[in-house]
UniProtKB/Swiss-Prot annotation:
(6S)-5,6,7,8-tetrahydrofolate binds at L132, G136, H137, L138. This is Serine hydroxymethyltransferase. Its EC number is 2.1.2.1. It catalyses: (6R)-5,10-methylene-5,6,7,8-tetrahydrofolate + glycine + H2O = (6S)-5,6,7,8-tetrahydrofolate + L-serine. GO terms for molecular function: glycine hydroxymethyltransferase activity; pyridoxal phosphate binding. Belongs to the SHMT family. Its cofactor is pyridoxal 5'-phosphate. Its main location: cytoplasm. Keywords: Amino-acid biosynthesis, Cytoplasm, One-carbon metabolism, Pyridoxal phosphate, Transferase. The modification N6-(pyridoxal phosphate)lysine is found at K241. It comes from Afipia carboxidovorans (strain ATCC 49405 / DSM 1227 / KCTC 32145 / OM5). HAMAP family: SHMT (MF_00051).
Length: 433
């Protein structure tokens, strides 16, 4: 048996061992993921690359602290420093979006939307949202999601001829179904939202108006997209995507009564202890988004998206609604005789990361699809500009045109050639170097 003196002198590696020493398998996985992010061109519209400061905050000792409740009103002691972090996050979010109230505790986009439902609706109430097949989101009433199981979802859609939302039809539908809540926002809609008209429609039927700006919040923060905050009763957003922060949620409102309901819905309604390390990282990201260079970043996202869309159109690809006014686009692959799943795999093999996506009135199943969704936030963060995105568009077209001529959905020679050129591009724009 070792003596107590020997125990006291034994190094305590729990506080000193590196990840590589403590868990080499996970360390290798992280190293591999860093390599993937460095050497591939990230075109998934919902992804971005955070700053080293955000990484540092999220990996901090604040992960150790439980803090049920809100700043100054916690159920645990020792919360003085996490109170500082959460208060900074709240105040910065309010300043960034011009809102009077902000809740920074939602752990995810799904939970932030669930909190609004819990705060403003009763099970069985009717609400309206954009159909998932037309560019909406699972949490806006998909039958497989809680929002579609616990509530009555009435979906509006887009016109067949131009793939745009018909606001007159939204008004007619609202008058017919008398929803308690109307949601604007989605995951694959590339054109502006008429927030003023949506609010007028909501008011005409006595409904709340909610905007889920998860995808375009960074563009709102950067001043290149209209803000929904002056029009909506409540606005939700994730803190990653175009906002370029850690993965999480944020709820904004200018109504004090709604703010109180939202706070109660988050805690104790849906969540217990908030993730204080993530909230600290949110605060860092909000500060970054308040800087003048973030406006330049947001402007570049949109310019790059338009350049990518126009390049693809120039190579014979159809873009849903004819183009984009934000950070994303849907590519209709049907004229090329391609499917989304096959196209996604070919592009990933070529170093171009994207996702298959349904298009409006898509005849294919969700795991097949007739489209691709492409976005520019992550690669814009790296420093790619219009010239580089024109190159990216040409590379995408080269791969897909080759795959369209292949009977087995692959073009190894072209894919390998494109992958080398992708590597040359990404080497010019390193991350975390």
């Amino acid at each position: 048996m070792p003596s107590s003196a020997q125990n006291a002198s034994t190094p305590n590696t729990f506080f000193t061992a590196s990840l590589a020493a403590a868990d080499p398998e996970i360390a290798d996985a992280i190293k591999g993921e860093l390599g993937r992010q460095q050497h591939e061109i990230e075109l998934i519209a919902s992804e971005n690359i955070v700053s080293r400061a955000v990484l540092e905050a999220q990996g901090s000792v604040m992960t150790n602290k439980y803090a049920e409740g809100y700043p100054g009103k916690r159920y645990y002691g020792g919360c003085e420093w996490v109170d500082v972090a959460e208060t900074l996050a709240i105040e910065r979010a309010k300043k960034l979006f011009g809102a009077q109230f902000a809740n920074v505790q939602p752990n995810s986009g799904s939970q932030m939307n669930q909190a609004v439902f819990l705060a403003l609706l009763q099970p069985g109430d009717t609400f309206m949202g954009l159909d998932l097949a037309a560019g909406g989101h699972l949490t806006h009433g998909s039958p497989v999601n809680m929002s579609g199981k616990w509530f009555k979802a009435a979906h509006y859609t887009v016109r067949r001829d131009d793939q745009l939302i018909d606001m007159d039809e939204v008004a007619k539908q609202a008058e017919q179904v008398k929803p308690k809540l109307i949601i604007a926002g989605g995951s694959a809609y590339s054109r502006p939202w008429d927030f003023k008209r949506f609010r007028e429609i909501a008011d005409s039927v006595g409904a709340y108006f909610m905007v889920d700006m998860a995808h375009f919040a960074g563009l709102v923060a950067g001043g290149v997209h209209a803000s929904p905050v002056p029009h909506a009763h409540v606005t939700t957003t994730t803190t990653h995507k175009s906002l370029r922060g850690p993965r999480g949620g944020l709820i904004l409102t200018n109504d004090e009564d709604i703010a109180k309901k939202i706070n109660s819905a988050i805690f104790p309604g849906l969540q217990g202890g908030p993730l204080m390390h993530v909230i600290a990282a949110k605060a860092v990201a909000f500060k970054e988004a308040l800087q003048p260079d973030f406006k330049v970043y947001a402007k570049n996202i949109v310019e790059n998206a338009r350049a990518l869309a126009e390049t693809l159109r120039g190579h014979g690809f159809e873009i849903v609604s004819g183009g984009t006014d934000n950070h994303l686009m849907l590519v209709d692959l049907r004229p090329k005789g391609l499917k989304g799943n096959i196209s996604e795999r070919a592009l990933v093999r070529s170093g171009l990361t994207c996702n298959k996506n349904g298009i409006p009135f898509d005849p294919e199943k969700p795991f097949v699809t007739s489209g691709l969704r492409l976005g520019t936030p992550a690669t814009t963060t790296r420093g790619f500009g219009v010239a580089e995105f024109k190159q990216v568009g040409a590379l995408i077209a080269e791969v897909l045109n080759a795959v369209a001529q292949s009977p087995d959905g692959a073009a190894p020679g072209v894919e390998e050639s494109v992958k080398k050129r992708v590597r040359e591009l990404t080497d010019r724009f390193p991350i975390y170097s």
